[in-house]
Every structure is written in structure tokens, then in C-alpha cells.
């Protein structure tokens, strides 16, 4: 058993069964594998239906946008439901939906079936916000940034294994990684059903759910109306747009620019995942000793700009070592931005609102990842392969002063209730 001092108003002691931590870590680990295992093969699954490389790039990015579109509408609903009914049932349902989505995407047979699979995954894709709310329930506020860093490192372990495994499994058929992703997600559901404890006790649950909590647009308006929260979210939004674009075009980009195959693409994803582990598991704790959350976030954003610059240069000179160096520096920045952002965000609310704020944050991220791939796909085809990287440099450079001027968010979140 692990003991943590409760972070609610009563300041009572909270006892957390070890399975709470184990299940949460296993969940994010398998989410890392499940999500990353399919990344190297998506363009190759689209290829049988569309032969033109330009149109293929558009469809690949649209598949990402459709997923994000569904997450945008589903995340606040799932967050509110988890605040009222608890994290456990929502997590299990979401994980089951993800497994079904992987299965449908793998079966394929027509382009619309691929989109159907992504839609199913997107509707249940709010599980990530629920998992972060789950950890926020059991971790004291002053330790959350550190633990969110470890959670991200565990995801990194999954993303080390997933892409390489996906690239290897693709040798037996491009759909095989999807089936494998479905199987490991179902195993997580089974483990959670028997061993996962509830993290949000009934006395701290939401009493009722209003339409405001379920409407993503109202949710966004309420969140952005908070003077101490809006700059944090706007800066993250500006960062997530190009990052969503890069994620969507990565496989297509490496295939078109450097002629990479699924195994090599998967290996690159895995190397990036290993870099995540180093950054979040070893570098992040040392940064927290000397810097606060905001300073770490800004350091991450500057690193991403440098990374995007090298990615753009690699395209202009067709020199893949520059691309690899750029991805490493970009990955470092992204690795330290995420935990610091989630740390700042989670400290702004009490336990009964964690699902809501995390769901609202995921809706904003989903909106960015819906817009980013669409813009990225269009400029990739019309302006050249370096265009998404230039977009990243410009938007993140604009985001830094927005975040730098933000005030302390620990004050007045109660207005949003």
C-alpha cells in the first residue's frame, strides 16, 4: 500500500492501493505501444486505395484529423462522466473502444473502413485525459509534475517498443500491427477489470452534469475566460498545431523525402521514444531542482524551434542526418514541455474538477491536432516538404511570449464551476 497526503480541501489522508499505480502505469505503457505501433504503416495502408503521393499525403493527414475531431467532442464528455461516475468505468470502456478501433482499421477493405476505425478510436480516445485525472487523484499537487514526467517516461518506453515492433510485424502484412494493438489493449481491459481500484471516492465526485460540461465549445470558452489559465492554454494550442502536423506527415515525409520503409520508420520512432525516456526519466527531475514549471516549458519550446529548423534544413539539402538531429532536439523539447504543462494545469483545480480540466485540455489539444494535420497536409503538397517545419518555427516562436507573460494559475479556477 502507498500513502499520500490528500490534495482536497479537507486535507485528509488518502490511501492508494498499489494496483492504482500499477494499472495506471500499465495503461499508459500500453497506450504508448498501441498508438505508436501503427504509426509506421499508416501510409502503406492507404497506398492500395490511392496511388498519387500528393493525394495519399492528404488522406493520411485527414485520418489524423478525423481522430482528433472525435476526441475534441468526446474528451469533455468523458472527463465530466469520470468526475461523476468515477475513473474506473470510463477507462475500461475507452480502452475497449480503442481495441475495437484498431481492429476495424486493420480489417480495412475500403477507405471508408479506415476512417470508421479512426472515428471509433477518437470517440474513446479521451482515455488519456481520464488517466491523467486518475493520477492527479492519487498524487499530491506538489509532486505531480515529477510524477507526470515519470508517466510520460513510461509512455516513452511504450513508444520505444511500439514502432520497431510495428515495423517488424508489417513484414507479415500491414494490418498485423493493428491486430496486435487490439490484443494488447484488450489485455489491459482484462487486467483493469479485475485489479484496477477506483481513484475518486464518492464524496469527492461531481453531484450533477450540466450541458455546459458536455459542450466542448462552452468548455473552451469557460477555460479561456480564465485570465490566469488562458495564456497557458493558448500557448499550448499554438505549439500543438505544428506538432500535430509533424506527427501526421512524419511517415509520409520520410517515405517521400528519404525513401524510408516501415522498418526504418519504426526504428526512428523507437529511437525518439528512447530519447523520451532519457529526457523525462533522468533530465526532467534534475531540471525541476533548478527551474519551475514555466521555465521548463519555455526551454522545451525553444528546443522545438531549433529542432524544426534542422528538420527544414534536412529537407532543403536532402540530408537525413540533419533530420535525425532535428528530431532529437525537437523530441527533447516536447518531452519536457508535456509534464511541465500538465503540472501547471493539474495544480489549478481540486480533485472533483481534474477530469473536467484534463478533458477540456485534451479538447483543445484535439482541436489543434485536427487543424494541424489539415494545414500541414495542404502546405506539404503545395509548398514543399519543408513547409510544416517552417510553420512550427513560426507558431512556437509566437507562443513563447504568450506563455512567458502568464500569471499564476493557482488562484481562481473556482469561477468555472
Please give the residue ranges for each predicted region.
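Juxtamembrane intracellular "pre-TM" segments in multi-pass secondary transporters
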Residues: 5-18, 197-235, 257
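Short amphipathic helix-loop junctions that connect adjacent transmembrane helices
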Residues: 41-57, 248-265
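Central cavity-lining transmembrane alpha-helices of secondary-active solute carriers
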Residues: 62-78, 270-283
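Conserved MFS/SLC helix-loop-helix module at the cytosolic interface between two early adjacent transmembrane helices
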Residues: 73-111
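Helix-to-loop junctions at the C-terminal end of transmembrane segments
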Residues: 74-86, 279-293, 380
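C-terminal ends and interior cores of transmembrane alpha-helices
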Residues: 96-109, 303-317
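Cytoplasmic helix-loop-helix junction between adjacent transmembrane helices
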Residues: 117-156
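A membrane-interface helix-boundary motif in multi-pass transporters
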Residues: 170-183, 378-396
Amino acid at each position: 500500500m502507498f500513502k499520500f497526503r490528500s490534495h482536497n480541501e479537507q486535507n485528509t489522508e488518502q490511501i492508494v492501493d498499489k494496483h492504482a499505480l500499477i494499472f495506471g502505469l500499465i495503461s499508459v505503457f500500453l497506450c504508448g505501444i498501441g498508438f505508436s505501433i501503427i504509426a509506421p504503416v499508416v501510409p502503406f495502408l492507404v497506398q492500395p486505395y490511392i496511388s498519387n503521393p500528393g493525394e495519399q499525403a492528404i488522406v493520411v493527414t485527414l485520418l489524423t484529423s478525423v481522430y482528433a475531431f472525435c476526441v475534441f467532442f468526446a474528451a469533455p464528455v468523458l472527463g465530466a462522466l469520470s468526475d461523476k461516475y468515477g475513473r474506473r468505468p470510463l477507462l475500461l470502456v475507452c480502452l475497449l473502444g480503442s481495441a475495437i478501433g484498431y481492429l476495424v482499421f486493420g480489417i480495412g477493405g475500403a477507405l471508408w473502413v479506415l476512417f470508421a476505425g479512426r472515428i471509433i478510436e477518437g470517440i474513446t480516445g479521451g482515455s488519456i485525459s481520464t488517466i491523467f485525472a486518475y493520477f492527479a487523484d492519487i498524487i499530491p499537487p506538489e509532486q505531480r509534475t515529477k510524477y507526470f514526467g515519470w508517466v510520460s517516461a513510461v509512455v516513452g518506453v511504450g513508444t520505444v517498443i511500439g514502432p520497431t515492433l510495428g515495423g517488424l510485424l508489417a513484414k507479415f502484412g500491414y494490418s498485423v500491427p493493428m491486430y496486435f494493438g487490439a490484443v494488447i489493449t484488450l489485455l489491459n481491459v482484462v487486467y483493469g477489470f479485475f485489479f484496477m481500484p477506483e481513484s475518486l471516492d464518492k464524496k469527492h465526485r461531481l453531484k450533477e452534469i450540466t450541458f455546459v460540461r458536455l459542450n466542448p465549445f462552452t468548455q473552451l470558452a469557460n477555460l479561456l475566460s480564465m485570465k490566469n489559465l488562458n495564456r497557458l492554454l493558448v500557448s499550448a494550442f499554438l505549439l500543438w498545431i505544428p506538432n500535430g502536423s509533424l506527427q501526421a506527415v512524419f511517415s509520409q515525409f520520410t517515405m517521400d523525402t528519404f525513401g524510408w520503409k516501415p522498418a526504418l520508420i519504426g526504428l526512428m520512432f523507437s529511437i525518439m521514444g528512447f530519447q523520451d525516456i532519457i529526457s523525462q526519466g533522468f533530465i526532467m527531475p534534475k531540471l525541476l531542482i533548478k527551474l519551475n514549471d514555466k521555465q521548463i516549458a519555455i526551454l522545451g519550446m525553444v528546443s522545438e524551434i531549433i529542432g524544426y529548423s534542422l528538420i527544414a534544413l534536412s529537407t532543403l539539402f536532402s540530408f537525413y542526418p540533419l533530420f535525425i538531429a532535428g528530431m532529437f532536439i525537437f523530441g527533447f523539447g516536447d518531452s519536457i514541455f508535456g509534464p511541465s504543462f500538465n503540472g501547471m494545469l493539474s495544480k489549478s483545480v481540486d480533485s472533483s474538477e481534474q477530469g473536467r480540466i484534463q478533458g477540456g485540455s485534451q479538447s483543445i489539444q484535439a482541436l489543434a491536432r485536427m487543424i494541424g494535420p489539415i494545414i500541414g497536409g495542404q502546405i506539404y503538397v503545395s509548398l514543399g516538404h519543408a513547409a510544416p517545419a517552417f510553420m512550427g518555427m513560426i507558431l512556437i516562436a509566437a507562443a513563447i511570449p504568450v506563455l512567458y507573460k502568464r500569471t499564476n494559475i493557482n488562484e481562481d479556477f473556482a469561477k468555472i464551476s
